[in-house]
């Protein structure tokens, strides 16, 4: 169909289908050529009149200037747009503007090498398809520096947009290692990642909010302080791993938020306790490490598994090992204690889960088995954050770990990074951290 704003004569031999194909409102396709480097699309605007930006007087035509920019790939080959710009001359003698050329930012910005469609296509490829800058440069028929220099300003503007932090009610935090080089060359190896865990119509998935150099409570505290009172007052739940530094930052900056200890990190140390007891009892009874044929050594893997997943034969093997020697009673008790910690998160209702958790917090620290008592003291130290799980509908830091997985994949795809600023922008993009900003919605 014809452009609704086009006033060009139908007798000029325009092809409406070609105009529809290039999909540039207000432009006509006037020629197509195929080069070794790809397709070249010649276009011109429909505007036959233009007013001077200085005085508003209708300008006079003053020739053409051809500008070539990189377009998004067409049919799998690189494409270029050759825009035959009209040059205009102001006829008003008192006007300071003598000549000027037409501009249209839907095609390209002034003096840019990549067109708007190419930039939009590249950003979407990075965001959703796991692309790399080098791969995009090959598909566009240009260089790495050209692609990144045009994309980076949009990503930086989106990262600086305060609109990204609107509506955050649930916050998660975790760290990851972004390089394995000398710290003196690239700075801290660890980055603290802050994640929006809010779910709802406007928050379909978790998204990365920021990456901050370092791993400490001070880093997290300073980031929260920089966000402002309005942001901090909106946080209702703050999920975290059992790291006291992050807990101190939450207590200092998010006084009204409920701290929730991640369930995985509650369950994770529990299966290790029976293993420690098994090795100690093994040494006490046999005087050596576990060997093939030793009753306790044969169940070393079963001690770490959930009892609800064991077959009848595996349950029988456990009973045989527990009753093989009177000293094995410590291993059996440790095993059942660890299983109860697992069961906390598998109760029918949150009330039942909290009741079992409270009972374990009271009994485990006084257990005569040292390894279980140590586990109990650790859980008791995090009592409030542990029990808060049952008051917040099972709030978890798990989505934060999922974001870390996306970051790891992005870093492997790019074959490592050297520039921390570029790394932060790329990771924010692929983890939906910039989706809320209009700067990435070209």
Predicted regions and their residues:
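Short, positively charged, Gly/Tyr-enriched micro-motifs
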Residues: 56-60, 66-171, 175-181, 232-233, ...
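A structural signal for short, well-ordered beta-strand segments and their strand-loop junctions
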Residues: 136, 172, 239, 259-262
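Short, surface-exposed amphipathic charged segments that create phosphate/polyanion-binding patches used
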Residues: 186-190, 271-283
């Amino acid at each position: 169909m014809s452009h609704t704003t086009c006033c060009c004569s139908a007798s000029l031999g325009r092809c409406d289908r070609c105009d529809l194909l290039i999909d540039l409102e207000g432009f006509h396709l006037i020629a197509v050529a195929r080069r070794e480097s790809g397709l070249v699309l010649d276009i011109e605007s429909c505007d036959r009149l233009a007013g001077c930006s200085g005085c508003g007087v209708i300008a006079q035509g003053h020739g053409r200037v051809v500008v070539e920019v990189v377009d998004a790939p067409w049919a799998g080959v690189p494409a270029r747009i050759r825009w035959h710009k009209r040059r205009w001359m102001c006829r008003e003698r008192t006007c300071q503007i003598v000549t000027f050329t037409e501009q249209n930012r839907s095609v390209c910005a002034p003096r840019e090498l990549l067109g708007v469609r190419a930039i939009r296509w590249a950003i979407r490829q990075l965001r959703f398809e796991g692309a790399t800058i080098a791969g995009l440069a090959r598909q566009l028929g240009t260089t790495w520096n050209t692609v990144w220099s045009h994309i980076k300003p949009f990503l930086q503007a989106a990262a600086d947009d305060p609109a990204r932090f609107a509506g955050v009610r649930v916050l998660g935090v975790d760290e990851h290692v972004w390089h394995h080089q000398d710290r003196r060359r690239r700075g801290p190896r660890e980055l603290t990642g802050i994640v929006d865990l809010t779910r709802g119509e406007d928050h379909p998935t978790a998204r990365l909010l920021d990456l901050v150099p370092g791993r400490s409570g001070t880093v997290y505290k300073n980031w929260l302080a920089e966000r402002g009172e309005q942001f901090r007052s909106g946080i209702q739940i703050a999920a975290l791993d059992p790291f006291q530094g992050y807990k101190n930052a939450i207590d200092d900056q998010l006084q009204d938020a409920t701290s929730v200890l991640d369930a995985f990190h509650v369950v994770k140390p529990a299966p290790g306790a029976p293993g420690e007891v098994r090795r100690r009892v093994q040494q006490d009874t046999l005087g050596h490490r576990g060997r093939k044929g030793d009753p306790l050594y044969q169940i070393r893997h079963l001690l770490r598994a959930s009892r609800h997943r064991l077959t009848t034969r595996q349950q029988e093997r456990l009973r045989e090992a527990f009753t093989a020697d009177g000293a094995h009673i410590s291993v059996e008790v440790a095993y059942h204690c660890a299983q109860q910690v697992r069961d906390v998160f598998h109760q029918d209702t949150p009330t039942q889960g909290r009741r079992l958790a409270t009972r374990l917090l009271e009994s485990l620290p006084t257990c005569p088995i040292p390894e279980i008592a140590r586990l109990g003291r650790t859980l008791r130290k995090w009592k409030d954050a542990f029990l808060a799980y049952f008051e917040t509908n099972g709030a978890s830091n798990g989505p934060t770990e999922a974001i870390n997985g996306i970051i790891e994949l992005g870093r492997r795809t790019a074959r490592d990074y050297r520039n921390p600023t570029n790394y932060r922008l790329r990771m924010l993009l692929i983890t939906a951290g910039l989706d809320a900003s209009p700067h990435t919605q070209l």
